[in-house]
């Protein structure tokens, strides 16, 4: 028997962003926005959200970035911009009923939220996602 869960869903996020080898890139931009919706009762993946994101400030991916992330230039060249993808993610969350239940974002460390998302929202001049119930 499993213990009752505090959250109905876990939303697993793992952003990928522009990068250079041995140097910083400013601003670093999110180029992949994936999310898994995991039911905490069954631990099954109920749905996924996945979009590539077109970088605006550094539209050409470095060879290092392509090698490190596996994302090709053609994946991002005609992709939507971050504000457009963020809006689609908010719609997806609403469509999935997430705004009417409890959920928690899950990432590997704090880099995705505290660095990638925060900086991308600042660069794109958009607000960060709504908080969980």
What are these regions (language model features)?
Residues 120-132:
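A short alpha->loop->secondary-structure connector
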Residues 7, 132-133:
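Short, well-ordered alpha-helix to beta-strand connector turns
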Residues 2-114, 118-120:
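Conserved non-catalytic scaffold segment of RNase H-like nuclease domains
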């Amino acid at each position: 028997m499993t213990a009752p869960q505090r959250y109905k869903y876990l939303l697993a996020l793992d952003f990928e962003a522009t990068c250079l080898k041995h140097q910083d890139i400013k601003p670093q931009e999110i180029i992949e926005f994936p999310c898994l919706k995991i039911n905490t009762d069954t631990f099954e993946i109920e749905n996924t959200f996945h979009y590539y994101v077109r970088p605006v400030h550094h539209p050409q991916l470095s060879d290092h970035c392509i090698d490190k992330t596996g994302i090709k230039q053609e994946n991002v060249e005609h992709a939507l911009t971050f504000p457009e993808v963020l809006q689609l993610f908010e719609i997806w969350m609403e469509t999935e009923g997430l705004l009417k239940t409890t959920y928690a974002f899950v990432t590997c460390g704090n880099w995705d939220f505290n660095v990638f998302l925060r900086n991308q929202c600042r660069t794109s001049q958009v607000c960060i996602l709504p908080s969980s119930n």
